[in-house]
From Swiss-Prot:
<dbReference type="GO" id="GO:0006508">
    <property type="term" value="P:proteolysis"/>
</dbReference>
<dbReference type="GO" id="GO:0016920">
    <property type="term" value="F:pyroglutamyl-peptidase activity"/>
</dbReference>
<keyword id="KW-0645">Protease</keyword>
<feature type="active site">
    <location>
        <position position="81"/>
    </location>
</feature>
<dbReference type="InterPro" id="IPR036440">
    <property type="entry name" value="Peptidase_C15-like_sf"/>
</dbReference>
<protein>
    <recommendedName>
        <fullName>Pyrrolidone-carboxylate peptidase</fullName>
        <ecNumber>3.4.19.3</ecNumber>
    </recommendedName>
</protein>
<feature type="active site">
    <location>
        <position position="144"/>
    </location>
</feature>
<keyword id="KW-0963">Cytoplasm</keyword>
<dbReference type="InterPro" id="IPR033693">
    <property type="entry name" value="PGPEP1_Glu_AS"/>
</dbReference>
<dbReference type="GO" id="GO:0005829">
    <property type="term" value="C:cytosol"/>
</dbReference>
<dbReference type="InterPro" id="IPR033694">
    <property type="entry name" value="PGPEP1_Cys_AS"/>
</dbReference>
<dbReference type="Pfam" id="PF01470">
    <property type="entry name" value="Peptidase_C15"/>
</dbReference>
<comment type="similarity">
    <text>Belongs to the peptidase C15 family.</text>
</comment>
<keyword id="KW-0788">Thiol protease</keyword>
<dbReference type="InterPro" id="IPR029762">
    <property type="entry name" value="PGP-I_bact-type"/>
</dbReference>
<comment type="function">
    <text>Removes 5-oxoproline from various penultimate amino acid residues except L-proline.</text>
</comment>
<feature type="active site">
    <location>
        <position position="168"/>
    </location>
</feature>
Amino acid sequence: MEKKVLLTGFDPFGGETVNPSWEAVKRLNGAAEGPASIVSEQVPTVFYKSLAVLREAIKKHQPDIIICVGQAGGRMQITPERVAINLNEARIPDNEGNQPVGEDISQGGPAAYWTGLPIKRIVEEIKKEGIPAAVSYTAGTFVCNHLFYGLMDEISRHHPHIRGGFIHIPYIPEQTLQKSAPSLSLDHITKALKIAAVTAAVHEDDIETGGGELH
């Protein structure tokens, strides 16, 4: 049975001229493999406005699965996120100058939401293709976590049939020419996100395997 998968990526932020999350996601717009039929939308790196754009994308596409994607400069792996927390704590301003500190994303909402994606299975499938991947247990407190939490809150309140989650990706090589940081090719990132979409479309349940962090 076909599953429509909505992928979102952000516009550039923090002085960057490119955001690999959108560069990879837009490559997959219209792609189909197995039961996964992929559509892509860009969201702004702006608190609350990103959620408004996401809600409109949900209305437009009526997806079965939503995977939001964001850049995590400094990471060297594809990292599906385990948990979103109800906190905006911005170290830098967003693209419209907003810099909330100690603010709830959803007043009265739960402290956190778990992902709705089979993230351990996604990690294993990505690693089978020789692409580095690992489960992450923190999505930060900037717009990525904001969108992740907002997505799961929206699903919980209004779209219980949708499964959703968030994946962080590294820089691409062109972003690291003037700084020392790990990167991954755009081809590898795009391939990994396609694997994630197909895996989520095929499997609702995750695998039982060891993981976690010691600190």
